[in-house]
């Protein structure tokens, strides 16, 4: 009986993978659904999209051009939010850098530059002093940067990040959450569709995101 049960489960899994499609994603295959959906900040018929990422994450760096192009294509259909996943806990320097740039109104200008510094220029931005030195060397006023870096607002948001990540069940990067409940990542898309080519994976991930935004919009 145990052997038969195992065979049936295996057959079901194979069938699930065989029917997987990025343009028609299936729950438990390309994406999962949060048991406790999170509140969203979208207004009207717009769909909120949240990306959990880390600057040192190679997969995030590879995903960034695809995600940026996808955001541009979606336009007014979505509200995009990025949340740094604090791998080092409530004092994570990379997350603090992101929050500091956001507080200064410099995030759009510097977000991609941080990725470039880490993955192209091979800068190690994992310690406070290294980050502060990099910021000063890259055109940011050191005094203003430190003011934001040490501000109550940044410190408060930084301390809340682990709880936010736990609420979204985000433990790896990149992870994208659509409408506070649909969770997808390039890794799950690759696994469910047996994709090994990076170009194909980026295309497929974009298709899954498209489908889930459409699905979410239908309930608005």
Residue ranges and their predicted role:
Residues 1-2, 107-112, 144:
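Long, low-complexity, intrinsically disordered polar/charged segments
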Residues 2-92, 209-210, 214-220:
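Extracytoplasmic thiol/disulfide redox context detector
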Residues 56, 67, 71-74, 101-105, ...:
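Sec/Tat-exported extracytoplasmic proteins
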Residues 64-71, 94-98, 111, 128, ...:
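Extracytoplasmic/secreted envelope proteins and their assembly/folding machinery
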Residues 73-104, 109-135:
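Structural microenvironment flanking redox-active thiols in thiol-disulfide oxidoreductases
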Residues 138-220:
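C-terminal cap of thioredoxin/glutaredoxin-like
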